[in-house]
Every structure is written in structure tokens, then in C-alpha cells.
């Protein structure tokens, strides 16, 4: 339809994949034509922060004058100067790469949606797993034309197409292994999985997806192993150096804790990590070539592998692509997701959606069931997560997320803003915007009843920048979350901007910043 198009992708790996796809259908990238006069031409241009300044500015000019009407890029492409009723697309609309780390902390999703509204264009949010934000916006009860967005509608793949294109996905939890009479129940890789993966290795590569490298700690019930959460805001709890237990989100102290599931009163620390996975798997699959692809390894992320029997161990986002001579040789014969239980202890507000996105991304590299592809989810996890993966139905999880956030007064059902900086500066800003006791934004009405609009403030680490070290050693840098109904989101933003401007204009001491709807609340 001769419309300009802007596509924002998470990383350069996705840009390279999309560039190769566009080349395969006859489109050319913006590059020198080889003529003596040094002319550049092409059907699409790439914008990203890794480009040389001259190349980036040349592509920017070609886009602004209309020479190139299709733009690919990372977050930097959200400001591509296209005109007319353009098509604005974003892949993985809740990934952390979409958020700008500089003031005013613009998010690629919000910028593209606003531009689509202003240009009378179309905004499309694509992802392996639907985000809670997209689910809420496409809900019939919330669809409408606002100042920053137009009407939204959900798009689903047809069930018949999904079934044919996806592999056979099985969840090997304790109940399923007991039904199969597997003698290795409780093993990290049970005998049933070893047998399936060994058979798949006879005809091609096999992918094993493991959690991110590194060690993190989480508190869980010592009996049922469910993650310990705050009774006030459902945030994750942490144990401080002095033994005190508090919420990471609202800072509330926890005493006389009791598990709501099994009524146990004892906690345990769970350390989540992936060290030593390659050596452990080498003993299970002797004589099989192995490829390790993680950002922390000396070799780093492996971009691609050949179609040959080999075992590939990769963390989410670092899965190598399979390169072969035909489409049937550009896929893994089987995919296994190890340590599914780590999903029970993730602490981010989008933790389940991020987990499902990573699982679906890995499984999408597997051969479809029509060509014998199988995917295994190994370990205990939330049944909703497992069913969403097995049925390839991410809206199932997204709907549960929206319902949970309606009860806990969290975005997208409610609007939220983070305020952080020196303790007295944060307190002054909260008072000026009316979020403290006695103000007109001090409480919110939720399904569970009326509750304070502010979570926190809680202490946060000192910044890494040299020019903000005046609070070093004082533990006086804090963060708070302010929540309001979506109808008052614009009002909250204006109040925060006004209070921040007053802080700067009056030369009041101390760091003070705010951000609307950040991915990580605390």
C-alpha cells in the first residue's frame, strides 16, 4: 500500500534475521550502489546505536527525505522521521531494551503508539507471548479512542495453523514422570527426557535452554517451596543482613509469616544459578559434540551452527540459529527447557510474561510436529505458564496477569510512577503531588478495598555515576511507587513534572528523578 514502515526490534540479532528475510524476498538494504559517484540506494534502512555516525546520519537523511520508506532498528529507530499514515511495529513490547535509560525515560512502545495516533497510522505490537499491557488494551471493556492511542483489537493465529506449525510440547513434572513410571523422578534431566533427546540427536541438533548465568537469591516456603510474598502488595520478600525480612516493593516489614498455601511458618533461601550445566550434561550425553552459547562464556554468544547432530546449551536470547540447505535443515530436532522451577522465584512484575517469552522463543526454533519436532518443559512451574506453552496460547497467561494486577493495583490496570533520589527530596515531591496522607491522591480504590497509593519508600543502592556520590555510605537514597487510576495518569505525569521543575528551579539539594510506568517498579 506504499506506506512507510518502522520496525523496532530488541537486539541486533533480530535485526540481522529480519535483514536476511527481507533480502530473501528481493528487498535491498540502503547501501552504496557501486557507481563511480558514490550513490546510495535501497529499499530499507537500518538505524541503531552501533552504526558509525556518518552511516547513521546518511540513513537518517535518506529516511527523512523519503528516499527510503522502510526502517529497521533497535530502540533508536522509534524516532525515525517517516511521514504520512505509517505502519509502526514493535517486537517483544515489554523487553527491557525498549526503555531508554536517559531522561525522560521514553519507552519505544509508548512512542510508537503515540506516533501512530498522531500520524493516523497503525500500531502493531508483536511478541511470542502477549504482554499484560496488550491484553488490557485489547479487552473490550477498555478499548477506546484516547489522546495517545486509538482503538485496539487482538490478533490470534488460527488454531489449526498453530497446531501444524508448533512442535509437540510435553511438561515433564513429577506427576507426569510418575505416570510414565520414570525411575529418575527428581533428577535435573530425567531418563524420559534423555531418551527423547538422544533419539533426536540421531537426525540433527538439539537445543537445551537453561536459566541465565549467575546466582540470585529468593525466599521460599521450606515445605511447599512456593515463593514468599508480601501480604500487603504481593511483592517478593528479601532477608536483610541483620535478619529482618521486608518487601522489595513497598518496604513493609514481615513478622509472624505463615504460608497461605500450606500454613508452614518457616522460610528457606533458594539460590538460582546455572553454573556447571555443561559438565553435568556431558556425562549424560557422552561422545556428543557440545556448543555453549551464553554471554558470560569466553566464546560469548554463538550466532549460528550447522545442521549436524550436536547438543547446544544456551541461555534465553542466546540461542544459535541453525543454518542448512533447506527449511527442514534450519531447525532443531528437539528443544528442552531445563530448570523450569526457577520461574517460581523470579521477582519482576513481568517475570511470568518474560519467562513465557523466553520459552516460546526457544521452542519456536524447533521443527514442527509434522516433521517430528518435540519440546520438553522439565521441572515444576506454575500450571498456567505450562498450559500457555503447551497450548501455545499466551493470552491465557496475559488474562491471569491482568486479573492479578487488578487485585494488587499495579499497571496496566492502574497507572504508576517511580520516584527516586534523596529521602527528603522524594518525600517533598510526594507531598507536593498530593500522594501522602491528606492529599487528593493518597488512596486508591481497588477490588480488595481502599489502600494507600504509595508503595515505599525503600532504600536503593547508590548510583554508579561519579557526580552523584554525595549520599555514599548514608543509605539515604530511596525509591517510591505512586499509583493512580488510569483516568488520572496524565494528571499524575503533569504533577510530577511540575514538582520536579520546582525542585530544580529552587536549587533544592539532592537527587530527584521520576519515571512513568517503568518495567521494574522497585
Where are these regions (language model features)?
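Conserved helicase ATPase motor motifs in RecA-like P-loop NTPase domains
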Residues: 96, 101-142, 146-158, 212, ...
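Cys/His-rich short segments
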Residues: 188-192, 196-286
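Conserved Walker A/P-loop ATP-binding site and its immediately adjacent core
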Residues: 4-26
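Accessory helical-bundle/CTD segments and flexible terminal tails appended to RecA-like ATPase motors
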Residues: 1, 153, 158-181, 285, ...
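SF2 helicase catalytic motif II
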Residues: 77-119, 331-346
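Conserved RecA-like ASCE P-loop NTPase motor core of nucleic-acid helicases/translocases
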Residues: 3-11, 45-47, 206-211, 420
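Conserved motor-coupling elements within RecA-like helicase/translocase cores
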Residues: 36-71, 284, 291-314, 319-325
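Conserved interdomain linker/interface between the two RecA-like ATPase lobes of SF2 helicase motors
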Residues: 1, 124, 128-222
Amino acid at each position: 500500500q506504499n506506506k512507510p514502515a518502522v520496525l523496532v526490534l530488541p537486539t541486533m540479532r533480530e535485526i540481522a534475521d529480519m535483514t536476511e528475510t527481507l533480502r530473501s524476498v528481493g528487498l535491498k538494504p540502503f547501501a552504496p550502489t557501486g557507481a563511480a559517484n558514490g550513490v546510495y540506494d535501497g529499499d530499507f534502512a537500518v538505524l541503531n546505536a552501533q552504526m558509525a555516525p556518518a552511516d547513521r546520519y546518511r540513513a537518517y537523511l535518506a529516511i527523512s527525505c523519503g528516499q527510503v520508506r522502510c526502517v529497521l532498528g533497535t530502540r533508536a529507530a522509534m524516532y525515525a522521521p517517516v511521514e504520512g499514515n505509517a505502519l509502526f511495529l514493535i517486537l517483544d513490547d515489554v523487553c527491557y531494551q525498549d526503555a531508554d535509560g536517559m531522561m525522560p525515560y521514553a519507552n519505544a512502545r509508548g512512542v510508537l503508539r503515540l506516533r501512530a495516533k498522531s500520524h493516523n497510522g497503525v500500531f502493531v505490537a508483536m511478541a511470542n507471548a502477549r504482554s499484560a499491557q496488550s491484553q488490557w488494551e485489547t479487552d473490550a471493556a477498555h478499548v477506546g479512542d484516547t489522546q495517545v492511542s486509538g482503538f485496539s483489537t487482538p490478533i490470534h493465529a488460527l488454531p489449526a495453523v498453530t497446531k501444524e506449525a508448533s512442535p509437540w510440547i510435553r511438561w515433564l513434572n513429577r506427576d507426569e514422570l510418575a505416570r510414565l513410571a520414570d525411575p529418575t523422578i527428581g533428577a535435573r534431566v530425567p531418563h524420559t527426557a534423555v531418551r527423547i533427546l538422544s533419539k533426536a540427536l540421531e537426525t540433527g541438533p538439539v537445543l537445551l535452554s537453561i536459566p541465565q548465568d549467575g546466582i540470585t537469591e529468593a525466599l521460599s516456603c521450606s515445605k511447599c517451596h512456593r515463593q514468599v510474598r508480601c501480604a500487603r502488595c504481593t511483592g517478593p520478600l528479601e532477608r536483610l543482613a541483620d535478619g529482618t525480612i521486608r518487601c522489595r516493593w513497598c518496604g513493609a516489614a514481615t513478622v509472624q509469616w505463615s504460608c497461605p498455601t500450606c500454613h508452614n511458618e518457616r522460610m528457606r533461601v533458594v539460590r538460582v544459578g546455572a553454573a556447571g550445566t555443561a559438565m553435568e550434561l556431558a556425562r549424560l550425553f557422552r561422545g556428543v559434540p557440545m556448543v555453549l552459547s551464553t554471554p558470560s562464556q569466553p566464546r560469548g554468544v554463538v550466532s549460528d551452527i550447522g545442521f549436524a547432530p550436536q547438543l547446544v546449551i544456551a541461555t534465553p536470547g542466546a540461542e544459535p540459529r541453525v543454518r542448512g540447505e533447506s527449511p527442514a535443515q534450519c531447525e532443531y530436532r528437539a528443544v528442552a527447557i531445563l530448570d523450569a522451577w526457577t520461574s517460581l522465584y523470579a521477582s519482576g512484575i513481568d517475570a511470568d510474561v518474560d519467562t513465557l517469552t523466553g520459552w516460546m522463543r526457544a521452542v519456536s526454533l524447533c521443527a514442527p510436529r509434522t516433521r517430528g519436532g518435540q519440546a520438553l518443559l522439565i521441572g515444576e512451574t506454575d500450571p498456567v505458564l505450562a498450559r500457555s506453552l503447551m497450548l501455545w496460547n499466551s493470552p491465557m497467561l496475559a488474562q491471569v496477569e491482568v486479573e492479578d494486577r487488578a487485585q494488587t493495583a499495579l499497571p496496566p490496570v492502574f497507572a504508576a510512577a517511580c520516584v527516586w533520589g534523596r529521602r527528603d527530596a522524594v518525600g517533598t515531591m510526594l507531598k507536593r503531588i498530593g500522594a501522602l496522607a491528606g492529599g487528593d491522591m493518597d488512596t486508591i480504590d481497588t477490588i480488595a478495598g481502599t489502600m494507600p497509593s504509595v508503595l515505599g519508600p525503600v532504600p536503593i543502592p547508590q548510583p554508579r555515576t561519579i557526580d552523584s556520590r554525595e549520599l555514599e555510605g548514608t543509605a539515604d537514597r530511596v525509591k517510591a511507587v505512586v499509583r493512580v487510576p488510569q483516568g488520572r495518569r496524565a494528571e499524575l505525569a503533569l504533577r510530577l513534572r511540575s514538582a520536579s521543575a520546582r525542585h530544580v528551579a529552587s536549587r533544592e539539594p539532592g537527587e530527584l528523578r521520576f519515571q512513568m510506568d517503568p518495567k521494574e517498579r522497585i
